[in-house]
Amino acid sequence: MTKKDKRTICLLGLLSIALVFILTSNVFGNTIDWYSQHVVIADALRHAIRSEGTLFPTYMKQLMGGGNIYHFSYYGYLRPDILIGALLIHVNMQTIIIAYSVLMLTLSVICCYIFLRQHTDNENICIFVSLLVLLSSIFFHSHKQIMFVNYMPYLFLALISIEKKNFAAFTLCGSMIVLHSYFYCIGCFIVCFIYLLYRYPAEWKKLFISYILIVLLTAILTIPTLYIILMNGKS
């Protein structure tokens, strides 16, 4: 990566953060879905983790009159911002989520640029497409329905890992995608598989092994969640 690329990355990052202050009011989020769901549920999740003293609490008394924590895994209860919130229990969860959402938005734009630079020497095209990412629905959902987009930087990082044939890094990125949004991980993994077949079809076995490792690493979240979904379907 050249000095010019590093300078461009810094400018894209600053522009992403500046856009948050320019296009939003005092709070990077709305009072409907964002606050009533994401902030409230995340705050309840971190308190459940603290009260039971484990990352895998079994019961949440704050929501739905009490319920299994895996009813809320759709929101990604093992996300880094929730775990950080459990450590920094005296910090407002709204502040933590806003900071994390801005970070994920910024990283999405930066990782998009880095990914594109692996394929073209035309810096202007890379900047233009990265700006399109910034101005797309990613910005909108970063302060509305955050689980729709908060996995995006990890998807770009997963594609970058495939390009570098670093399947250990891909396994880590894939696991983070699942922990952020298991609902969208299937689509992400299909994209990664298609990209691998396009770039390095002979490496498909390594990718398959990475997928198995991702399933095993995230089983503590996905298997109980699948059980809850099946039980709710029967009822």
Where are these predicted regions, by residue range?
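Membrane-embedded transmembrane-helix bundle of lipid-linked glycan/lipid transferases
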Residues: 1-235
